[in-house]
């Protein structure tokens, strides 16, 4: 769809705690460039950003700012959503998933001041 759709078209406001990632309408140019490489897009609730941040901190001892944790949503959805499991089946990927590695482009976190980290760690949204 590239720039033919906006977040408002699907009932979202565009207001987010992940302000560095907020894009109300995708770029037509970038959409065209990415089309051969992209199988889908997703949205993530702000509350999940903080949940993923706490999970990564607890299990991996890695602190990422909440917006960087949006990258976690894709692999999570692969296991939770039937339409994505169907995509995997339809593309003959079921046998490969056991050896799959999900690489997350997760920048951010090392320069977040300690008091802001604590605020993030104690942020709970719906």
Please annotate each region the language model reported.
Residues 1-36, 86-126:
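Glycine-rich phosphate/pyrophosphate-binding loop at beta-loop-alpha junctions
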Residues 25-94:
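Active-site-adjacent helical/loop segments in soluble small-molecule enzymes
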